[in-house]
Amino acid sequence: MRCPFCGSDDTQVKDSRPAEDNSAIRRRRICPDCGGRFTTFERVQLRELTVLKKTGRKAPFDRNKLVRSFEIALRKRPVDRDRIERAVSGIVRRLESSGETEISSEQIGLQVLEALKSLDDVAFVRYASVYRDFSHAEDFEQVISEITAKISQDHEPG
């Protein structure tokens, strides 16, 4: 692994342990040339995924972009980083095991919405407003009524 500080190719692993929900290995590394310390993550990649954008353009799947989408929707919300990582890992696992190499951005967006719905209602509405391209207050009202109906249904005695 190349040192991000000095560019040396000779770095040493000082510590390895499972990370997140055991879907990655966290490695602490040190560079003998400059003494720099840094962390890397190693994940299993079942297949190369390509995202098919709405414009028809294709782009390599970027797990970090998926994480950023969650972080933006969940900004200033009381959701642990571990829960975000588990949600992202679950989505990536489902995408990789789907058998498809090209995944539409719409499919990814729907999976993010589904995950956010179970993580945080406010984040769900935030993400939905961008994903579904809300342009009127009524759009927000409709999604909020859907959430309210679901909450009422979940709390019915039975």
UniProtKB/Swiss-Prot annotation:
Domain ATP-cone: 49-139
Superkingdom field: Bacteria
GO biological process entries: negative regulation of DNA-templated transcription
Keywords: ATP-binding, DNA-binding, Metal-binding, Nucleotide-binding, Repressor, Transcription, Transcription regulation, Zinc, Zinc-finger
Protein name as annotated: Transcriptional repressor NrdR
Keyword Transmembrane helix part of the UniProt annotation: no
Zinc finger (unnamed): 3-34
HAMAP family for this protein: NrdR
Cofactor binding summary note: Binds 1 zinc ion.
GO molecular-function terms, A-Z: ATP binding; DNA binding; zinc ion binding
Cofactor: Zn(2+)
Region span, Disordered: 1-22
Family membership: Belongs to the NrdR family.
Role: Negatively regulates transcription of bacterial ribonucleotide reductase nrd genes and operons by binding to NrdR-boxes.
Coiled-coil residues: none
Segments of skewed composition (Basic and acidic residues): 11-22
Organism: Allorhizobium ampelinum (strain ATCC BAA-846 / DSM 112012 / S4) (Agrobacterium vitis (strain S4))
Residues annotated as transmembrane: none
